Amino acid sequence: MPVTPTSLADHLLVALPSLLDATFARSVALICQHDENGAMGVLVNQPSEYTLGEVLAQMDITTGDGDLQARMVLNGGPVHPERGFVIHDDARAWDSSLIVGEGLYLTTSRDILEAMARGEGPANAVVTLGCAGWGAGQLESELSENSWLTVPADAELVFQLPLEQRWQGAASRIGVDLFRLTDYSGHV
């Protein structure tokens, strides 16, 4: 009987210390979609060089909210780095949204940014440029190589925990101290 893969949507991937790839080292990725065709997610702990004010200005969206303008945009991953992805907690019917899990949504349409600029957006939102993608079987292979830990998604971690604490913070949700792990094993 064939094994049906378990979907990791609504989970966080936490890079293990042995994952040295420049893009994903010490990263935390929120998996938004995962099926037999592959997986898609966004990194939630890597700052980009842009503020939301700069991104909104590029899109000709104006706002007088200084806090919103100064908000950091995250590097969501190496796929479609020119495209915006908004992780949020607002169940309204945006033009292009995906339910990630309980209280977590991914929206890629302009209307959510316009609502945020007017002060009518989600209570909690993280804006990223780019996303991460895995082909069919690729994520499963990386998991079997011990590149990642999987942790149930946690809105408090995604929206509230400071960026520099998210990597260890996600692992600690399942009792793992990443600073005590080694990337080798063997006999003495």
Swiss-Prot record:
One of its GO terms (cellular component) is cytosol. Signal peptide: none annotated. Pfam families: DUF179. InterPro entries: AlgH-like (IPR003774). Belongs to the UPF0301 (AlgH) family. This is UPF0301 protein Smal_0940. It comes from Stenotrophomonas maltophilia (strain R551-3).
